[in-house]
């Protein structure tokens, strides 16, 4: 299965290059037969939504889920993707997050579009080298997409 109408709606306003990568990654994901669907959790964010997410774990209840008020989501240069089965996100399944990372990096390489993953902030191919891992997050790097 590829992207749903809901996923495509969530990609509205996202930079076309990133949409190209996500669409190709979804096609690759579908061939893996993981039993999980790939969903677009979030694309473009409003400043209000970003402020609410930033407050989480700081001045509002919950755990910290973002480290900046200057998110690439605000400009349509980022997406959050999640593997889901029976309505449940596979948060604890490292293998699925690694598979998603591989799908995205393969799709980006094929399209010759640079991406930065929340699992690999410095883009060196080594995932989770920092404590601020954000497995669902993929963005177009500022140095290529100001």
Regions inferred by a protein language model and the residue ranges of each:
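Active-site acidic/histidine clusters and adjacent loop/turn architecture
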Residues: 1-42
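Short, well-structured alpha-helical interface segments that form or flank functional binding sites
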Residues: 20, 48, 99
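Catalytic cores and adjacent binding grooves of peptidoglycan-active enzymes
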Residues: 68-146
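Cytochrome P450 catalytic domain signature, combining two hallmark sequence patches
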Residues: 57-69
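Extended, low-complexity, intrinsically disordered C-terminal regulatory tails
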Residues: 26-60, 110, 120
């Amino acid at each position: 299965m590829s992207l749903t109408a809901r996923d495509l709606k969530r990609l509205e306003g996202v930079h076309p290059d990133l949409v190209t990568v996500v669409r190709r990654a979804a096609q690759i994901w579908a061939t893996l037969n993981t039993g999980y669907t790939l969903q677009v959790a979030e694309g473009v964010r409003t400043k209000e939504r970003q402020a609410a997410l930033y407050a989480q774990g700081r001045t509002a209840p919950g755990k910290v889920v973002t480290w900046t008020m200057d998110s690439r989501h605000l400009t349509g240069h980022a997406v959050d993707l999640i593997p889901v089965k029976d309505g449940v996100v596979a948060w604890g399944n490292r293998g699925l997050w690694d598979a998603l990372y591989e799908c995205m990096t393969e799709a980006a390489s094929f399209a010759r579009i640079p991406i930065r993953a929340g699992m690999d902030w410095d883009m060196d191919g080594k995932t989770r080298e920092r404590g601020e891992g954000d497995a669902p997050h993929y963005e177009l790097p500022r140095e290529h997409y100001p």
